C-alpha cells in the first residue's frame, strides 16, 4: 500500500493519507484521508468506471448507494459525509472509525465474541426494520470493524439490496464465497435470514481461529460448515445457535436478526460445569477456557459430608 500523500483533483478539500485497500475488479480504492476544512480523518472511496457516450457507466447505481447511506442513522454504521465526481470516476466520503476489521490478527475470548455478535445483530435489526428494509449481502470479517472498547461498526454497503430487490451498486460478484448464503450463490430470493449466514460464518472463523481466506477448509462434502468438533469447550446451546445461523436453507435459520438476537441473549457461551452423580459422591468439573477444577463431595452419612477440591 502506498503511504504517499497527495491531493485529489478537482476537490482539494480531501487529502489522502494512505491507501487502506482496493478492489481491482470493482475499480474501487479506499483511502484514509483528511478533511482540510474540519481537520478530521475520513474514509474516502474512489471509484473508477468507463465513460460511455455522455453517461457514466454505473453512476445511477452508485448514486443509489449514496441514497441508502444518507438515510441510515445508527451508531454502528459510519455516516455518509460527501460525494463528488472526478475526471476518472467518482468519490464518496464517510466517517472514519478508529477500529480494525475482524480479519486483522487479533484474539477475542468467547464472551467477547458473543458481545460482538449481539452488536452486529442490533445493527441488522435496525436495517431490517427500515422501510424499505436493507439487506447488506456482504457480511464477513473484513466488513465488521471493532475498536478497543468492543464497539462494532458495519461497513461497505456496496452490495446492499434495498426493499424488494434493487441492488445499491452494480458489481461483478454478489458477495464473498464462504460467507454468501446459498440463496445468494444461486440467485434465489433473499430475505432477512440471508445476512445471518454471513454473520454466523464470521463468528465461526473467529471462534476456530480460521482466516477468512481459508473458510473453505471448514466446509464438508455437502456444503455445510463443519465446525462443531473444533469447539469442544463451548456450550452446546451456543454451538446449536451457531449451527442454526449457517443452515444452508434459509427457512431453517432464524427468520430475522431480531429472533437471532433474542435467542442469543440468554445463552452462556462457555460450557457449564459438568456434574456427575454417584451413590457416595458428587463430582464437579469445570470445562471453561483456561480453567480446570474438580470438586469432590464425599457423602459419609445422611447428615454428614466431607468435601475436598483438587485444582
Task: Show which residues each predicted segment covers.
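AlphaC helix of the eukaryotic protein kinase fold
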Residues: 51-71
